[in-house]
Amino acid sequence: MIRITSRSVKEAAGIRSVSSSTVRLNIAPKVVSPPVPPPVKPQGSEIPPPPPPPPLKAKRFSLFGFLFKTTLLATVVYGGTLYAATKNDKVMDFVIDKQLPFHEELIDLIENGSTEDLQEAWEQLKNKFTDVKLPTKDDIDELTQKLEHRGEDIIKETKKKIASTHIGHKSGTDLTPTEQLQRGVEIESVKKDVAHLPLIELNSDLGKSVDETVKQTITSFNNFIQSIDASSLATKDDKLITSINTSVNQLASRLNSLTKDFDNELQNKLKVSQTELFSSFTKKELELTENLLHQFSTEKQQLEAKLNQKLSQEIQAARAAISQAASNAVAMVRIEQTKNFEKLVSEKLNEERNGRLANLEKLNDRIVELEKFAEGFETQIVSNHKKAIIHQAVSKLKSLLLAPAAGDKPQPIKPYIDELTKIATDDEVLALAIKDLSPLITNESTHSILTNAQLLSRWEQLAPELRSASLLPPNAGLLGHLASIVFSKLLLPVKGVKEDGKDIESVIGRVESSLARGELDIAVEEAANLKGWSRKLANDWVVEGRKRLEIEFLLGLIESESKII
């Protein structure tokens, strides 16, 4: 049907060729003799020769090929990079830094993938292409309807083109000479009478078994042939129509056989699938029944367990509520009895108070006064006891620290400090004094605190070094030290005390005099006022003297505060 239409269109287009020319600047165009029309050969029983093959076209640029090659190259490079990343740490760092798309999934596939996974993916892809459904009868009907509509559209377009060609032919006798010169050369077609073309008919054995869609297609072909007969441009070609008729009969028989084969195959597949579906349905029904029975028994057991648990909880709650109500009732009875008893006792007491116990309030006031007196007396006794204990502890500490006996063994001081700390918890001054005293004598013994006599003897031992140090010049070297030692032997000791003397002999004399009189604070002050190397030599002696002064002051403070308590 399509071939006939295209050929008729070509013949209609080949009837005339119009050439036009224009008139420019009012110059008459050259008169060109009209070309001789080609001889029209009557179409008889001979088949026209096939058209010449089209010339080979030069290969053009293909966007699809370019995109395909580019995509293939990018895929190979990307996959090679990810594979190299699994083998090289530097490439892996590059991939992670650049955050290439889908690099984690692809690297995991490269590292953990196997041939079994590839085979499974290939089978899935293969199943997608093999599970192609055969075209159904409805699909075939739809295809034939589309072909029929397309043929009708082509017929309509052909008729329109033929009508336009007839309208375009206009006689040139009515035109002026100028218009005839300006008008293009026209070629008149030679018309011939064409006999009616034979219609397409099916064989008698295929007429009943052919589908309705094929019959409709044949009808449309016959309509098309009749339209060609009605046209004045058609030529007679019986062999072509006969070949078309034969081809249509063959197509009808082929379609009939394909339809029968398709129906038979469809019936066989339907039977097989029905059997398989019935067997699978039976198996699934049995499995579903077993699962339902199992679930039913499981749910039944769970419901029984939950029901028993709920009943036991409700029974326990009821028992607890009943026992609580009973205990509340008993408690209320006891409270009521207690109230009645208290009421009875209060009534009896009021009777006795108004009678024999009339002076009970006065006796109660006297007892309260006695209690207050006893509390005050007890407080005074406790404070006196504390005073006595503090006096004893302070006296013991003074005797051990400030005036120890030569034959006594050294004893730790910490137990006495702990005893004072326990007693002096209520007084803030005592607590602060003991707190300052503890770090001074906690790690000391009874013989580690130097007495005045020991300090005096140490000062006398330190005096020659102080004399030699006073003779040292600034930044003295070894020779200066040797010279100071020699010259210090030549110094004569000063007798008496010079109150205003600032030389080393005056200072040594004042310190010895103060230690002899028991004025340790003045002696420590004189030694602390030394300068230079002499002060560094006397530093240890000053530290020991200050420690003794601090201990004496804190013990005196504790003793004075204990008298005020």
From Swiss-Prot:
Residues 1-25 form a transit peptide. Residues 86-565 are mitochondrial intermembrane. Pfam families: Mitofilin. Residues 26-62 are mitochondrial matrix. GO terms for cellular component: MICOS complex. Residues 34-54 are annotated as: Disordered. InterPro entries: MIC60. Its main location: mitochondrion. Residues 282-381 form a coiled coil. It comes from the Eukaryota. The keyword Transit peptide applies. The keyword Acyltransferase does not apply. Belongs to the MICOS complex subunit Mic60 family. Component of the mitochondrial contact site and cristae organizing system (MICOS) complex. This is MICOS complex subunit MIC60. It comes from Candida albicans (strain WO-1).
